[in-house]
UniProtKB/Swiss-Prot annotation:
Organism listed in the record: Anaeromyxobacter dehalogenans (strain 2CP-C)
Subcellular location: Cytoplasm
SMART domains membership: GuKc
Listed name of the protein: Guanylate kinase
Reaction it catalyzes: GMP + ATP = GDP + ADP
Lineage of the organism: Bacteria, Pseudomonadati, Myxococcota, Myxococcia, Myxococcales
InterPro entries: GK/Ca_channel_bsu (IPR008145), Guanylate_kin-like_dom (IPR008144), Guanylate_kinase (IPR017665), Guanylate_kinase_CS (IPR020590), P-loop_NTPase (IPR027417)
Amino acid sequence: MSSDAAAQERLPGLLLVLSAPSGAGKTTLAHRLREASPDAVFSISATTRAPRGAEREGVDYHFVTAERFTELVAQGAFAEWAEVHGQRYGTLRATVDEALAAGKLALFDIDVQGGAQIKAAWPQQAATVLVLPPDEAELERRLRGRDTDSDETIRRRLVAARAEVARGLGSYDYVVVNDVLEGALAQLQAIVRHERLRHAGRWDPEAARVAEACRRSAAPLGGWAS
């Protein structure tokens, strides 16, 4: 094992929260980051919905009954939870603590409200990133390019996007504009390296430069600035 690889293994765990309006490319970025990071894992949520297709317990979700979910809520077991389309989803505190204790990079693909709750629960170990398309026109183009949604659905998604972006710009640590996928991925990797080194009391000037340029207060927001 090289000295660089050994140093990477000794880095502390990090919770990386990725939030974005639908169509920004967040999920693709999250999977690319996972593939490029040997110690990265996706946070596994608990849910009341039934498994779909090849989904597996403990791999894709923790599948629980509605009654058990209610018990877990009452016990304070969730760092965050929400109801979506009649089913409940939540992040278990124990799962997150295990990832941190193991020195993992835990990836969260959740909305801004959930991300804010993760940040509140682990303020020192969590970094929140808002992923944006270059502007609203590009977001609409991407949504229409899917060719799966009606005009009314796209309209609703754009309204929801404006609200989600406004919430994220008001609270998140970083902003990454996903114009070119590889460039956005490189920015995420720099943010991860900067945050983990910072917690270890170490420094990488280039990672710090890129990460600081993505700070919410410094990031170029393009068509989302108004």
